[in-house]
Amino acid sequence: MKVRASVRKICSRCVALKRHGVLIVLCSNPKHKQRQG
């Protein structure tokens, strides 16, 4: 899980979600997991 100021989709399989006011990017590739912080 990468914690970044600006999260974005890296590939076509990435999905952007908003959980409890925090932007999260999930993907089948675990390297693409990101959280806004």
Curated annotation (Swiss-Prot):
Single Gene Ontology BP annotation: translation
Cell compartments where the protein resides: Plastid, Chloroplast
SUPFAM superfamilies in UniProt: Ribosomal protein L36 (SSF57840)
A GO term for molecular function: structural constituent of ribosome
Keywords, ordered alphabetically: Chloroplast, Plastid, Ribonucleoprotein, Ribosomal protein
Keyword Plastid in annotation: yes
Pfam families: Ribosomal_L36
Record's GO cellular component terms: chloroplast; ribonucleoprotein complex; ribosome
Leader sequence segment: none
InterPro entries, per the entry: Ribosomal_bL36, Ribosomal_bL36_sp
Coiled-coil regions listed: none
Similarity annotation: Belongs to the bacterial ribosomal protein bL36 family.
PANTHER family with a match to the protein in the record: 50S RIBOSOMAL PROTEIN L36, CHLOROPLASTIC (PTHR42888), LARGE RIBOSOMAL SUBUNIT PROTEIN BL36C (PTHR42888:SF1)
Protein's name in the database: Large ribosomal subunit protein bL36c
Species lineage: Eukaryota, Rhodophyta, Bangiophyceae, Cyanidiales, Cyanidiaceae
Gene name linked to the record: rpl36
